[in-house]
């Protein structure tokens, strides 16, 4: 937990989730504070239906809790952070409505506050889903750091909701002001996106994949996953296999096709990702599968898994960090049975082999190219 966020409604001690004393990244930034200052200075009425979209760690929702906002997020971690930050502020979390991007949005929205996400696709999808609840009098304000707001960002607001302009920058943050146009004729929501995989990627070659908005590389198979699919282990005899950080689920689905007797668990902290994995699996496989939105393997019993397959992210929103990968590796070690294996795909420069040796006492290089490595660690 770092310095508190000072707002017109008070100062709030905020933390990311899960809280890690080694993590020096803040749970709020200048754009959160800028948006809250603007709401107070402009006298924006907050007595109606207030919706907060994309609140990264609950900063906006916590500061506005007295107005009983509805938060909509794609992130399990952001949702849990919001619960804990509300508790720190002495607010009963049940007084705030917490929805996911897969839930039905409110029918009427009087104030829409948008924390601009890293994914333009997710922003596009969510604005389409929220548009029916936006009316002529809805106050729409977006917020983000200058480096996060582009011409393409503004065009999405204009194309889906109405005329859009930006504020002056303050502390490298900027606001977006959108005036809803009830007569606007918008194109249909293009999400989810479905396509067939190319040849040469193992058992899933030529098969259909579903990507909901916000999933990494939603319009094509990313090169890291392509490399991983070519070097997946034979898991014959494995009872339970985990696709950890599953994204659209192609890795776990490939395992299900080659080892139909194995139960595959798909895990991701993104609700959009797990929905994508569920559809990808059901379109291609007939085996047994479980789908879990959560913080890695924290909800999985110890010593209950035979193989974990992992392509860990190394970004948290705009920040680069290895905290997520380390948490995934430690969670995998706890969940694996003795003799169980963790297989990891990663960029060469990230040095995951050192982390695996430190944690498991071993690390084997299975495959590599100029950009990626596939590593294997065995739980003793």
From Swiss-Prot:
GO CC terms in record: cytoplasm
Reactions catalysed: guanosine(1835) in 23S rRNA + S-adenosyl-L-methionine = N(2)-methylguanosine(1835) in 23S rRNA + S-adenosyl-L-homocysteine + H(+)
UniProt-annotated location(s): Cytoplasm
EC numbers, comma separated: 2.1.1.174
A Pfam family matched in the record: MTS
UniProt-listed InterPro entries: DNA_methylase_N6_adenine_CS, rRNA_m2G-MeTrfase_RlmG, RsmC/RlmG, SAM-dependent_MTases_sf, Small_mtfrase_dom
Domain of life: Bacteria
Keywords carried by this UniProt record: Cytoplasm, Methyltransferase, rRNA processing, S-adenosyl-L-methionine, Transferase
One Gene Ontology molecular-function label: 23S rRNA (guanine(1835)-N(2))-methyltransferase activity
Function (record text): Specifically methylates the guanine in position 1835 (m2G1835) of 23S rRNA.
HAMAP family reported for this sequence: 23SrRNA_methyltr_G
Protein name per the record: Ribosomal RNA large subunit methyltransferase G
Underlying gene: rlmG
């Amino acid at each position: 937990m770092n310095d508190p966020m000072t707002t017109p409604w008070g100062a709030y001690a905020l933390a990311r989730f899960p809280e890690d004393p080694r993590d020096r990244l803040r749970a709020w930034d200048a754009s959160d504070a800028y948006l809250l200052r603007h709401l107070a200075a402009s006298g924006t009425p907050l007595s109606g239906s207030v919706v907060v979209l994309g609140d990264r760690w609950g900063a906006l929702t916590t500061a506005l809790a007295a107005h009983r906002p509805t938060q909509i997020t794609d992130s399990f971690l952001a949702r849990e952070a919001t619960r804990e930050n509300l508790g720190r502020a002495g607010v009963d979390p049940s007084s705030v409505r917490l929805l996911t991007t897969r839930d039905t949005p409110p029918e009427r929205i009087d104030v829409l506050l948008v924390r601009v996400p890293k994914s333009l696709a997710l922003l596009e999808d969510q604005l389409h889903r929220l548009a029916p609840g936006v009316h002529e009098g809805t106050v729409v304000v977006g917020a983000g750091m200058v480096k996060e707001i582009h011409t393409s960002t503004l065009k999405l607001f204009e194309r889906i909701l109405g005329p859009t302009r930006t504020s002056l920058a303050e502390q490298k943050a900027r606001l977006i002001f959108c005036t809803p146009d009830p007569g606007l004729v918008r194109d249909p929501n293009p999400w989810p996106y479905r396509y067939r995989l190319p040849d040469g990627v193992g058992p899933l070659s030529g098969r259909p994949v579903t990507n909901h908005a916000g999933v990494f590389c939603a319009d094509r198979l990313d090169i890291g996953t392509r490399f991983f699919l070519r070097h997946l282990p034979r898991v014959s005899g494995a009872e339970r296999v985990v696709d950890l950080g599953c994204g659209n689920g192609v890795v776990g689905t490939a395992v299900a096709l080659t080892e139909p007797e194995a139960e595959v668990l798909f895990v991701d902290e993104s609700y959009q990702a797990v929905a994508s994995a569920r559809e990808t699996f059901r379109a291609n496989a007939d085996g047994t599968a479980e789908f879990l939105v959560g913080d890695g393997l924290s909800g999985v019993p110890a010593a209950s898994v035979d193989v974990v397959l992992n392509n860990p992210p190394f970004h948290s929103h705009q920040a680069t960090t290895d905290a997520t990968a380390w948490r995934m590796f430690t969670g995998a070690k706890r969940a694996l049975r003795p003799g169980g294996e963790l297989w990891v795909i990663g960029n060469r420069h990230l040095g995951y082999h050192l982390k695996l040796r430190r944690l498991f006492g071993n690390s084997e290089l299975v495959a590599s190219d100029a950009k990626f490595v596939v590593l294997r660690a065995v739980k003793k």
